[in-house]
Amino acid sequence: MDIISFYRVERWLFERLIPVLPKIVQLLIFLIFNSKITADSKIGKGSYCVCKGISTVLIPGTEIGENCVLGLRFSTVRQFPYKEVPCLKNNVWVGPNVIIAGPVVIEDDVVIAGNSFVNRSVPIGAIVAGCPAKIIGWRKNLDYAIETNPKYKDGRMPFLTK
């Protein structure tokens, strides 16, 4: 079982107003995965965490859309003085060690590169990277589909040149 399976159980118990059991499941998530996902966060269908969700931290109220891929050590945090929390729309790919801070909206079909710090909203189809994150490209300009998993190629990569 992965962290999303535990979250789904926690969320189901939370929605049915069962008092103590969601906190017990949240404790299990912390002990097994070293992660924190509260029951009032919303994670859409088809979304998953790589490496079973190790070290994932979602602050209460975080919304994640459908078919999102969340990298290892993905975190969402609040940003003072705002009350709102991050919202990820559908088909967002988040790399490892990404932090999303503040009341930002990550629109559909966005790619966030690893080790990025996102503190501004990201438009549809953007590819962002850096600390703080900046737009480095657009998904529509890619000559391949990032969500597919092509077959492995034979051989080795060529050497670096100047």
Language-model regions: role of each:
Residues 32, 53, 83:
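Short coil/loop residues immediately preceding or within conserved phosphate-binding loops
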Residues 78-80, 99-104, 141-142, 156-161:
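Short C-terminal domain-edge/linker segments immediately following a structured domain
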